[in-house]
Regions:
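N-terminal secretory signal peptides that target proteins for export/translocation
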Residues: 1-2
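Bacterial N-terminal signal peptides
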Residues: 5-17
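Boundary at the C-terminal end of the N-terminal hydrophobic targeting segment
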Residues: 19-21
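Short, glycine-/small- and polar/acidic-enriched structural segments
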Residues: 24-160, 164-169, 173-181, 196-197, ...
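Periplasmic-binding protein-like
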Residues: 102-111, 192-217, 228, 263-266
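Second-shell loop/turn segments in exported
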Residues: 126-130, 171-172, 219, 232-238
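Extracellular glycan-interaction surfaces
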Residues: 187
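Secondary-structure end/capping motifs
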Residues: 220-266
Length: 266
């Protein structure tokens, strides 16, 4: 995920680490740990968080819709979420602000295995699985309207994290929310030939896939700026040492040492 990874700092200059007890910070990921989180993992690898005086707890979510709401409730300091989703949170009055960028290009797709589905127009009367309420329904609606369908022509069901397994089991005809560098690649490695529709090719404006949000009251806290400074160091090191960082990641997390993650890391 190196080519599409950035760690934009929206809060100004970094604050260097100071002596004393490490300051605790909780980051809730958007999904289970995967190569899209590589800059975070590398910042941890190289000790960048510790150098900034931080003790960072990285938490995969129990529900992919939950992370920003935990930040809004002040149960976590930061969360990874999706740029379009931020507009939904604003409409709901959630006190969230974007503080940084993790992935600055779209990754979202609609994926099918049925070769008769050659465009989103062929989803009429089909069942589509999704994982994150709100944004994925809106994204799919834009895509099918671009193809002159109505959103109600498609049945949607929430499959949570089980995008590929729901597709492989025939529970759904297609899924939205699978990434072109993760779920599409996973299916190929399983010998399948997925039909992949990139969302930006069907009326969805380009956007930043993964962003970092904080509670509105906390955006000026020094630990937020320290985290972003460390993350930038992780991103820079990742770009300079892709193979070394993969090997370190695979060693530290052997359960994630798979061909899928190895290819996606690049």
């Amino acid at each position: 995920m190196i080519k599409q990874t950035v760690c934009g700092l929206l809060l100004g200059a970094a604050i260097t680490g100071q002596a004393g007890a490490a300051e605790k910070l909780t980051l809730v990921l958007d999904w289970y740990i995967n190569p899209d989180h590589a800059p975070i993992m590398v910042a941890e690898q190289i000790g960048a968080f510790k150098a900034e005086g931080l003790d960072v707890k990285i938490v995969p979510p129990s529900d992919p819709a939950l992370p920003p709401r935990l930040v809004a409730a002040k149960q976590a300091d930061l969360a990874i979420t999706y740029q379009p989703q931020l507009h939904f949170f604003a409409d709901q009055g959630l006190p969230l602000m974007r503080v940084g960028t993790l992935i600055n290009t779209p990754l979202n797709t609609v994926i099918a295995l049925d070769k008769s589905i050659t465009s989103p127009a062929d989803l009429k009367g089909k069942t589509v699985g999704y994982s994150v309420s709100g944004i994925e329904q809106a994204t799919l609606a834009t895509m099918v309207e671009h193809e002159h369908l109505k959103p109600q022509d498609i049945k949607l069901i929430n499959v949570n994290f089980q995008l590929t397994s729901a597709l492989l089991a025939g529970q759904v005809d297609a899924v939205i929310g699978g990434y072109r560098n993760i779920e599409a690649l996973e299916l190929k490695l399983q010998g399948k030939t997925p039909v992949v529709f990139n969302v930006e090719d069907y009326g969805v404006p380009a956007y930043d896939e993964l962003i970092i949000v904080a509670h509105r009251d906390a955006v000026n806290e020094p630990k937020i700026r320290k985290f972003l400074a460390a993350l930038k160091q992780g991103s820079d090191y990742l770009h300079a040492h892709p193979q070394d960082t993969w090997l370190a990641f695979a060693k530290a997390r052997p359960e994630l040492n798979t061909e899928l993650n190895k290819q996606a890391w690049q």
